[in-house]
Amino acid sequence: YTLSLHDALPILPPEIIVGIIGVETRWGRVMGKTRILDALATLSFNYPRRAEYFSSELETFLLMARSEQDDPLDLKGSFAGAMGYGQFMPSSYRQYAVDFNGDGHINLWDPVDAIGSVANYFKQHGWVSGDLVAVQALGQAPGLNNGFKTKYSVSQLAAAGLTPTQPLGNHQQASLLRLDIGTGYQYWYGLPNFYTITRYNHSTHYAMAVWQLGLAVSQARMQ
């Protein structure tokens, strides 16, 4: 089921879905054993700073269980209340989850619905089909701020001493990504699709892990 459905998903390449589900749950092997009701109730009452957020998630979870005719006591996930293969929070379920297998239910613990829901999440966050994600840079730019929220013109990055290892297509701007590889830093041009991956988890290293894991799995399948 992991890849045969992707013909129906022209928006998002299979390797991104494989990367997301791989990083989140090791392809379904680690989806969490905490009762979601307990997790969200505990966080709602014991963490005042985020009580409003988790109370809203708890309400949405209970509405989800009712609409899907699930017993809320049976559903298990992460300590933070994230659910299923893609570790959706209840609010993400409400906004982005889809019934991809057409059985009349949205089930985030079903791999088919999970694949469709991850794809829809990316579609709604602006993924551009066929576009680049990131391009490695030659050179170092220690004087520039880095991170997926930065924005530089290609000429600014060139003036700082960076050169892309492949053409950037029509992109005239990029974020400057810096990865610690132990022996030093590796710089990358981050493009809009990379930023879209960070909408799933707001971390440069997370997004790079998702992308590179997906590519590695894709390449391994081709060998």
Segment roles from a protein language model:
Residues 2-9:
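Short, small-residue-biased leader/transition segments that mark boundaries at the very start
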Residues 8, 26, 43-51, 75-82, ...:
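Second-shell loop/turn segments in exported
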Residues 168-223:
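C-terminal functional modules
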